[in-house]
UniProtKB/Swiss-Prot annotation:
Source superkingdom: Bacteria
Gene: rex
Protein known as: Redox-sensing transcriptional repressor Rex
Disulfide bond entries: none
The species this protein was found in: Exiguobacterium sibiricum (strain DSM 17290 / CCUG 55495 / CIP 109462 / JCM 13490 / 255-15)
Family, as annotated: Belongs to the transcriptional regulatory Rex family.
Alphabetic keyword roster: Cytoplasm, DNA-binding, NAD, Repressor, Transcription, Transcription regulation
Lineage of origin: Bacteria, Bacillati, Bacillota, Bacilli, Bacillales
Residue ranges for the DNA-binding region feature of this UniProt entry: 18-57
């Protein structure tokens, strides 16, 4: 078992929320235990990978028994800080930004969009799904007032870096970047780049060049 300060592989870390969501659904349905094979079928991750992921955290299950659902749920809630709410700011309330506001992490009680920003004066002063929209010039004051740690960036790509610079200056330490721009940020700031056009091109490439006959290709 790794120590509490040991960092697990990033690929494993990215799968933890996936495991948590399924375990939560099992718990809500009244299921008491689950096998790695059942987990594998549900989340489309092979059993060996699941067992390896879980091994980083010690003995989460028992051979021949599987995993206790309530124990797993408690573990993942603690590991993923599900009892702590992370406030998120939405920067850019266009079509994509509005979709995020409408969704607002309905299946995740630990993150919520609390504030949005846009340069369009017609949107400023309004709300979208109860999320107030402020002008981008108000970011400094409102991000600090709302204790925002994470920002979702859906602005035009030519403005992405300058907006990111401001966010970092105002104390944001995590950015989910949906623009094509590759952001330069300090080492203490985490950025996840999600370029939908690249994801689509990648999907088409894998469809054409990799066999789907076994268990499919998953990212």
């Amino acid at each position: 078992m790794n120590g509490p300060d040991t960092k697990i592989p990033q690929a494993t870390a990215k799968r933890l929320p996936l495991y948590y969501r399924f375990i939560q659904s099992l718990y809500n349905s009244g299921k008491l235990r689950v096998s790695s094979a059942e987990l594998s079928e549900a989340v489309k991750v092979d059993s060996a990978t699941i067992r390896r992921d879980f091994s980083y955290f010690g003995a989460l299950g028992k051979k021949g028994y599987g995993y206790n659902v309530q124990h797993l749920l408690t573990f993942f809630r603690k590991t993923l800080n599900q009892d702590e709410v992370t406030n998120v700011a939405l920067i850019g309330v266009g079509h994509l930004g509005t979709a995020f506001a409408n969704y607002n992490f309905l299946k995740n009680n630990s993150t919520r969009i609390v504030i949005a920003f846009d340069a369009d004066e017609d949107k400023v002063g309004t709300t979208t799904q109860d999320v107030p929209i402020y002008h981008v010039s108000d970011m400094k004051e409102q991000i600090k007032a709302n204790h925002v740690d994470v920002a979702i960036l859906t602005v035009p790509s030519q403005f992405a870096q300058s907006v990111a610079d401001e966010l970092v200056e105002y104390g944001v330490t995590g950015i989910l970047n949906f623009t094509p721009a590759r952001l330069n940020v300090p080492a203490h700031v985490r950025v996840h780049h999600i370029d939908l056009s690249i994801e689509l091109q990648s999907l088409v490439y894998f469809m054409k060049h990799y066999s789907q006959s076994a268990e499919g290709v998953k990212s």
